Curated annotation (Swiss-Prot):
Membrane-crossing segments per the record: 33-53, 77-98, 113-133, 178-198, 226-246, 288-308, 320-340, 347-367
Protein name (record): Cytochrome b
Cofactor: heme b
GO biological process terms, semicolon-separated: mitochondrial electron transport, ubiquinol to cytochrome c
Positions bound to heme b b562: H83, H182
């Protein structure tokens, strides 16, 4: 009998990607996050689809349509809570996935890495436009503040902002187009994920040691399918705990009030997963400078392959680089905390110090550590 799995045109692609894929035998649980992100994307698309059936993108009815979903639609509260907290899980997995890539030198697969950075930016854009849709106070003011940043672009800034708004302020036209963007972007993300996987499977996975894994590879199924299912179980458990017991813990209380253009909240802040970038933006007194720093905080990932000076790929055997990596992690946690605090001392100076340190570690200290570790590899006799 002909094995369909290996001969059927469609099954063959699936087989080469998820079943007979030769995988390094030593990859750890840090390699679980790719599949977890895929599951997060599926959850977000499915819950989002059901929410969009009941949501109306009109300034007069958007807020009440979300209330209607939670009160009157069968399990609407659950779908909404899964979608809102699913976004948080998505970003938790994303940050861990990127962190893994930095620690183990996965960025040296340049095409895969660059597509990954584009994916990160697209997911951030999707989350931003999605946050505006419930039309609560923080949704409205968050949209106003963040879109207004584009006015810092010389000459075309103001025109560009009004073009995005569809008027002279965030209003019905803005909400309608943001809903359209929020609906289409996940499908663009799905297409980018396929390209990401395509480039990854051209080279094969990296591994913790950072050395050529071709000497010892095992089939993806059953070894890593079982391993991924364990990670998936933990993530689903965490998501359900969040959605069922603490659905609003990561949200903003201001979003329980309908959007009011006449009443500004005392402290405007985005969702937790944007706070690190928001803190970098606020730490620069100049508007255009802040916008450039905000973009640089993400786009800096694109230059990482060119800043790699070490003879070793992974940080597994590089103690100085490891120390800097964990300093960078602590630094990002500090920036996230600062982004949620009001603009007053001592938060301003802490934010500025953390912002400088962020760029200093990536652009200067890590490449220097790589060179120093190379020198330490040389025999002393």
């Amino acid at each position: 009998m002909i094995n369909l799995r290996k001969t059927h045109p469609l099954m063959k692609i699936i087989n080469h990607s998820f079943i007979d894929l030769p995988t390094p035998s030593n990859i750890s649980a840090w390699w679980n996050f790719g599949s977890l992100l895929g599951v997060c994307l599926i959850i977000q698309i499915l819950t989002g689809l059901f929410l969009s059936m009941h949501y109306t993108s009109d300034t007069l009815t958007a807020f009440s349509s979300v209330v209607h979903i939670c009160r009157d639609v069968n399990y609407g509260w659950l779908i909404r809570n899964l979608h809102a907290n699913g976004a948080s899980m998505f970003f938790m997995c994303l940050f861990l996935h990127v962190g893994r890539g930095i620690y183990y030198g996965s960025y040296l697969y340049k095409e895969t890495w660059n597509i990954g950075v584009i994916l990160l930016l697209t997911v951030m854009a999707t989350a931003f436009v999605g946050y505006v849709l419930p039309w609560g106070q923080m949704s409205f003011w968050g949209a106003t503040v963040i879109t207004n940043l584009l006015s810092a672009i010389p000459y075309i800034g103001t025109t560009l902002v009004e073009w995005i708004w569809g008027g002279f302020s965030v209003d019905k036209a803005t909400l309608t187009r943001f809903f359209a963007f929020h609906f289409i972007l996940p499908f663009i993300i799905t297409a980018l994920v396929i390209v990401h996987l395509l480039f990854l499977h051209e080279t094969g996975s990296n591994n913790p040691s950072g050395i050529d894994p071709n000497a010892d590879k095992i089939p993806f199924h059953p070894y890593y399918t079982i391993k991924d299912i364990m990670g998936l179980t933990i993530m689903i458990l965490a998501l359900l705990t969040l959605a069922l017991f603490h659905p609003d813990v990561l949200g903003d209380p201001d979003n329980f009030s309908p959007a009011n253009p006449l009443n500004t909240p005392p402290h405007i802040k985005p969702e937790w997963y944007f706070l690190f970038a928001y803190a970098i933006l606020r730490s620069i007194p100049n508007k255009l400078g802040g916008v450039i720093a905000l973009l640089a905080s993400i786009l800096i990932l694109l230059v990482m392959p060119f800043l790699h000076t070490s003879k070793q790929r992974s940080m597994m055997f590089r103690p100085i680089s490891q120390t800097l990596f964990w300093l960078l992690t602590a630094n990002l946690a500090t920036l996230t905390w600062i982004g949620g605090q009001p603009v007053e001392e001592p938060y301003i100076i802490i934010g500025q110090a953390a912002s400088i340190t962020y760029f200093l570690i990536i652009l200067v200290l890590m490449p220097m550590a790589g060179l120093l570790e190379n020198h330490m590899l040389k025999p002393k006799w």
